[in-house]
Amino acid sequence: VLLTTESCYGGNYSWADGSGNAGDIFFLSEDAGATWKTLNPWGASPTVDANGNGWISGSSIHWAGTLEFDPFDSKKVWVGSGNGVFRTDDLTAAVPLWKFQSKGIEETVPLEVVSVPGGPLVTAIMDYDGASYKDITVSTPVHSNPIGSSNSLGYAALVGGFLRSGRVTDYGAKPAVTYDVLYHSADSGRTWKATDTASLPGSAGTLAMSADGRVFLLRPSYTHTGKNASTSTFYRSADAGKTWKPVTGLSTQDGKMISDPVNPANFYIVPSGYQGDVYASTDTGATFSKVGTLINNATGEYSASSGLLRANPYAAGDLWIALDAAQSWNASGFSSNGLAHSTDGGKTWTRIKTMVACLSVGLGKAAPGSDYPTLYMWGKANSEPLGIYRSIDKGQTWLRINDDQHQYGGPANGGFVVGDFNVYGRVYMSTAGRGIVYGNIGEIPTTSIDGRKMTAPRVRLSLHGRDLHIQDLGTKDARLELMDVSGRILQQQEVKATAVKLNENLHGLVIARLRLGSTTLASLRFVLP
């Protein structure tokens, strides 16, 4: 009989790299429960093996929810942990070794991502810190000096420096102890050093760094009482976090802040809520003043709703903001404030009229031949459906780059859609517990169709009322088939135009398939009333 504790962290888990953590305890009985022995002896090393998954090292088996014996080998056991599945091949060993079995299926909540031009991709996620990726296709160890949940990243664009904040709970202590931490990296997240938190004014929260890395800004999750108490919830440190002083000039205690990636003296803050004010600092964050508004005073047609500012890393004061950011997913519909752009540090704003609703915006590497970063956004462009869009002309035109089968529930907790500054066309989006999804511009495949070598077009289908729109077909030889779930053909026809009118007698779940010879070019599932 084998049993474990559940969220009672008295066990010690040691890894081959010398790291360790507290977790659940295993108990084994081989006499029907008359006697028991503990399988987690303190000091034994190693007791767990990352098994090629660099990010899991330093964690533990915890929240144990299920145990399963191999029905053909009682020495082999699986356990379901809060971070995945572990297995031991010899439960009877003096110190059983548990190997991590989950490859590529860990579900995480991403909060922030930064693509460093000429450098790595740096992430902040809940529960497992995040990492600095040279190659996003390779399993990578989490940030050194682990926190657990990295609440925020501050980025110094001119020097590649980072700040990372959070709260650490030491479950090995009796009772468990929780404390605030703030880590600094001077090498784009490859290594991290702890800063002095003795004077930290509150629980580590949202961060920003000046472009040269010399000034830190912090909006704590909550402020401490006593010697560090203040009515301000924005603080500034000019000595690497040793001392903090409240910033002045703000009429808000909450909001999103960023540094100017080109001018180290400038910071920007948009308060949370719907007031639409934009604040800026030109003295490295010591004082702020209102410089502009996101409300169109003539028509009152748009305002900020907790929008996250994005800055062009190659031009000072060049800012973008999504004006519908409070709604990462809303089944009943969205506001239609859209997207706004400023080139003077937030003093004046121009609404991008091609964008109907913009819930998140980000920038990435410029397209070949372009001198301006590519824009990515989650929202609705013109009369197109909700999705991920790309623009290579500062938002004048947009191309949807996902389809209805790849929405992932929208940007969710992290609220971000951002491009990669090293790979044109690569885009990242946060999700609700599904990790960071990314997309690339793929090569158009060459396919053999009916004995002919042809370039298969990258086609998309989308439903607009009872019209099925066909995008980027590039041939007149395709055939459209509409089927029910059993595969019965409901409607079929040769495609002669970019839109097909659906028969009025079609109702319920319909599967559309566009075919060229024996090759399926695109498919779409939808429900008709």
Predicted region positions:
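Residue-level signature of beta-propeller blades and closely related beta-rich strand-turn architectures
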Residues: 7-8, 83, 91, 127, ...
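Short, conserved, GDST-rich strand-edge loop motifs in beta-rich repeat architectures
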Residues: 5-24, 140, 168-177, 221-229, ...
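Signature of short aromatic-glycine-proline-rich micro-motifs recurring in repeat-based ectodomains
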Residues: 52-68, 110, 148-152, 204, ...
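Conserved blade-ending motifs and adjacent loop-strand segments that build the rim/top face
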Residues: 46-52, 101-111, 147-151, 353-362, ...
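Blade-level signature of beta-propeller repeat domains, shared across WD40, Kelch, NHL, RCC1
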Residues: 409-445
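Conserved Ser/Thr-centered positions that define the repeating blades of beta-propeller domains
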Residues: 29-30, 71, 87-89, 127-134, ...
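Surface-exposed loop and turn segments in beta-propeller and other repeat-based domains
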Residues: 38-58, 294-300, 404-409
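C-terminal outer-membrane/trafficking sorting elements
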Residues: 450-529
